Amino acid sequence: MAKEKYDRSKPHVNIGTIGHVDHGKTTLTAAITTVLARRLPSAVNTPKDYASIDAAPEERERGITINTAHVEYETEKRHYAHIDAPGHADYVKNMITGAAQMDGAILVVASTDGPMPQTREHILLSRQVGVKHLIVFMNKVDLVDDEELLELVEMEIRDLLSEYDFPGDDIPVIQGSALKALEGDSKYEDIIMDLMNTVDEYIPEPERDTDKPLLLPVEDVFSITGRGTVASGRIDRGVVRVNDEVEIVGLKEESQKAVVTGVEMFRKQLDEGIAGDNVGVLLRGIQRDEIERGQVLAAPGSIKPHTKFKGEVYILTKEEGGRHTPFFNNYRPQFYFRTTDVTGSIELPAGTEMVMPGDNVTIDVELIHPIAVEKGTTFSIREGGRTVGSGIVTEIEA
């Protein structure tokens, strides 16, 4: 059966839900798809229930979301790919790969709790990975009788956003109940429509880097019998077309060339994938074990694998979930680039004996495996599964 072509008539925007565990991110995602299906029925707008978004079996048993669920829906103005980013601290790694795919995000805060530790962590992560536009959805307002309490929670959220260099005073805050909307209460359905209008207006259409050379961080790899190997991920910049030659860069000293024989998005064939699209790219002549998560597909010659660079980093404070103690020269954490962790050692500037939580510092890094990096590439510093710093590459050294 021939696959139907993907419709590009509406601008495409990547958004997602972030926030503390059990504050209602997945319920809100379900409510958005369900209310849009009721109010703006279309081929794209189909209701998704909580269980289908929270799909993997081990997730539901623990009542927490581990994987990153992708759903699609549309408003009158736009087509959205929506990521339900996991809330639990153990799954921050997935949050980082998920948040890296958002043009904007809806921060879900339960009005009954107010901001919690992971609310803070997700705001920080959003700032780190370059999610510039946040909208707040204060959930569960039906459970709070006191108007003053709601005002207090809103002020607290705005202060927290400002603390992390978001425009806390200007960010839209929508108060509603995802569960009530999901259950069909028209007052709360109206609020979901209001939320989507706000997303349409407040999250700008992203400036896509379509004129730059292709860069596609590989998130997943699988093989299709008889057709070859597929690498999937979100195109960071540039365009990928059928018959293009691409280079597989990173984790190995030598880059490898391949030819693209197919591009698809949401299981539909495309002539080309452009920056911002989540695509699967079929590669001719590449074995399943010759490409892996953490590598990138790039325009030939546009980016090289490196092991040594200078970076400007911010080390998180204990309150932000970072280290409680300083680190010294030759500290060896993991460096998280795009979709993967690589161990590296840190050399401190001459005269700097140690780095305290909360410090900014320029460091020299040497990775144990080469990674496709360039000036301006961002990374997180992690140890034992938690983020302890964030940084940006300022200079390539080798």
Curated annotation (Swiss-Prot):
EC number: 3.6.5.3
Catalyzed reaction equations: GTP + H2O = GDP + phosphate + H(+)
Chain residue ranges for the region called G4: 139-142
GO function terms (MF aspect): GTP binding; GTPase activity; translation elongation factor activity
Record flagged with keyword rRNA-binding: no
UniProt cross-references to PROSITE patterns, sorted A to Z: G_TR_1, G_TR_2
Residues bound to GTP: 19-26, 84-88, 139-142
Protein name per its UniProtKB record: Elongation factor Tu
Taxonomic source organism: Streptococcus thermophilus (strain ATCC BAA-250 / LMG 18311)
Upper classification of the organism: Bacteria, Bacillati, Bacillota, Bacilli, Lactobacillales
